[in-house]
């Protein structure tokens, strides 16, 4: 288990060798349904949206994030510093930090893979419920888009890390969940070494900016679907 201080010490967001921890490998984005009727009506009871109002607090740098991010409850003084934020959204257009537009220049000094030590860090907290029957299955959480890197905890236990702002990040929560209420904590870092690859004529906006879903799957399920083509006899090269 890694706490906040330990993930800050690892400094994964400036390590070009590390771009994920415990993230499930990318796979085809197919959907599973319990019955043919559900499939025909596109009714997916196995996929639950976690979008909505989350608790949010912005810090000037990862090193400033307190261990209380992982606490089950916050003190009255700490709670006063947290505000509701819409997920999905970006924090700059929710009244936190400033958006930056760049064409060909970077928004920080160029020294890859180093990014500024004053690196705005958005912390998110939310809760959701899980039933006894759901605990018997595999429960994956899918972040469809987070800019630019993030660490994830569930019920105070470290789950993993991901960067790559425009691709989904999926983690298996099965070993971390309990029956009843569960809590998530997410630490989003604005700048990472991946930011060097993502800069070109764009607005820099940060946070959990795409959907978050909890996907419940049978213990045995189809994880990936792919096609391996072959050349016909009439094709030469």
Which residues does each PLM region occupy?
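Mature N-terminal segment immediately following signal peptide/propeptide cleavage
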Residues: 45-57
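Terminal leader/tail segments of proteins
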Residues: 2-3
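Contiguous beta-strand segments within globular domains
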Residues: 229-237
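Beta-propeller folds
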Residues: 36, 48, 62-63, 71, ...
